[in-house]
Curated annotation (Swiss-Prot):
One of its GO terms (molecular function) is translation elongation factor activity. It is found in: Cytoplasm. It comes from the Bacteria. It is an enzyme of class 3 (hydrolase). Belongs to the TRAFAC class translation factor GTPase superfamily. Classic translation factor GTPase family. EF-Tu/EF-1A subfamily. Residues 19-26 are annotated as: G1. This is Elongation factor Tu. InterPro entries: EF-Tu_GTP-bd (IPR041709), EF-Tu_GTPase (IPR050055), EFTu-like_2 (IPR004161), EFTU_2 (IPR033720), G_TR_CS (IPR031157), P-loop_NTPase (IPR027417), Small_GTP-bd (IPR005225), T_Tr_GTP-bd_dom (IPR000795). The lineage of its organism: Bacteria, Bacillati, Actinomycetota, Actinomycetes, Mycobacteriales. Mg(2+) binds at residue 26. It holds the Pfam family GTP_EFTU_D2.
Length: 396
């Protein structure tokens, strides 16, 4: 039995299963955990189908999503795998960013070929910036005709190419059900799939390698030392004595130097992505900085007031609006740590947006917000979440 020891040094990769309902996403997820458990028992728990299928509810930006998280390891990597069983859950997950993916396994039943949701999922994956897709051609045990399998494979490759994904991506013929039943040939197919995942999904850029950014959550004064801003470092690293800029919300940019980094009341040389820190800032008064601004590596992010967003609007049952909204709708847009009012312009030809819809809108904010394409936000009315979205394009 191959023994792989648990190493925290293994690269960590976030992946998920996507594809049409009933093509076997959840069964495949269960099969992967079983096959890897049998291969590396000390590294992996086996998860039964119904444990994954009964996806727990999660709240992300005020939206309830049913989503399952499983984790497993191959020899090379540690994976966190998300499976959103329902089609609506998948769409909500993609738009709200509840679980971001470094790559996805597109599950296509060989018996059906690509179906409408297959196309929709691939399109959404492109829109939200999933970097890589490879394919599990599931239920391949149920198709005897080699030509038919080749035809389905060709169709899937065309679909990937149409959305600018790698059309030479691995397409692995699997049978999740047979693998779960322990059929040796199909167990091997799942092993091959995971080898392909290891090899083809590129290693993600670590958050610490990106330029520094920290949203300001709180500001206070320490007598005799100066002003401290606290927050969770979103990306990058900040070192003591480095120059930073404070941007967003106000019209002007403030330059300053970090004279101290503190975490759990201890002084550090640096703060990095994921850390909850306090930054001591030189020459800054309490009123010079406020919640909702961001502290950044100089010149790496600019505040904007106009953008196009892709949004999901909560249905009435989800606690959203009971009525549609129209052009010039004025809700608050919650970015990172604060609400900013914005005016909505609907796409040409769209008269109104109904609760439960997903659509693209243009927004003009009354204050600038530091943003990049891909940044997530919630849409709120008086503190109640009515939708969620992501910045697709910055206009101004």
């Amino acid at each position: 039995m191959a023994k792989a020891k648990f190493e925290r040094t293994k690269p960590h990769v976030n992946i998920g299963t996507i594809g049409h309902v009933d093509h076997g996403k959840t069964t495949l997820t269960a099969a992967i955990t079983k096959v890897l458990h049998d291969k590396f028992p000390n590294l992996n728990e086996s998860r039964a189908f119904d444990q994954i299928d009964n996806a727990p509810e999660e709240r992300q930006r005020g939206i309830t999503i049913n989503i399952s998280h499983v984790e497993y390891q191959t020899e090379k990597r540690h994976y966190a795998h998300v499976d959103a069983p329902g089609h609506a859950d998948y769409i909500k997950n993609m738009i709200t960013g509840a679980a971001q993916m470094d790559g996805a396994i597109l599950v296509v039943a060989a018996t059906d070929g690509p179906m409408p949701q297959t196309r929709e999922h691939v399109l959404l994956a492109r829109q939200v910036g999933v970097p890589y897709i490879l394919v599990a051609l599931n239920k391949s045990d149920a198709v005897d005709d080699e030509e038919l399998l080749e035809l389905v494979e060709m169709e899937v490759r065309e679909l990937l190419a149409a959305q600018e994904f790698d059309e030479d991506a691995p397409v692995v013929r699997v049978s999740a059900l047979k693998a779960l039943e322990g059929d040796a040939k199909w167990v091997e197919s799942v092993t091959q799939l995971m080898d392909a995942v290891d090899e083809s999904i590129p290693a993600p850029v670590r958050e610490t390698d990106k330029p520094f950014l920290m949203p300001v959550e709180d500001v206070f004064t320490i007598t005799g030392r100066g002003t401290v801003v606290t927050g969770r470092v979103e990306r990058g690293v900040v070192n003591v004595n480095e120059e930073v800029e404070i941007v967003g919300i106000r019209q002007t940019t403030t330059k300053t130097t970090v004279t101290g980094v503190e975490m759990f009341r201890k002084l550090l040389d640096q703060g990095q992505a994921g850390d909850n820190v306090g930054l001591l800032l030189r020459g800054i008064k309490r009123e010079d900085v406020e919640r909702g601004q961001v502290v950044i590596k100089p010149g790496t992010t600019t505040p904007h007031t106009e953008f196009e967003g892709q949004v999901y609007i909560l249905s009435k049952d989800e606690g959203g609006r009971h009525t549609p909204f129209f052009n010039n709708y004025r809700p608050q847009f919650y970015f990172r740590t604060t609400d900013v009012t914005g005016v909505v312009t609907l796409p040409e030809g769209t008269e109104m947006v109904m609760p439960g819809d997903n659509t693209n809108i243009s927004v003009t904010l009354i204050q600038p917000v530091a943003m990049d394409e891909g940044l997530r936000f919630a849409i709120r009315e008086g503190g109640r979440t009515v939708g969620a979205g992501r910045v697709v394009k910055i206009i101004k």
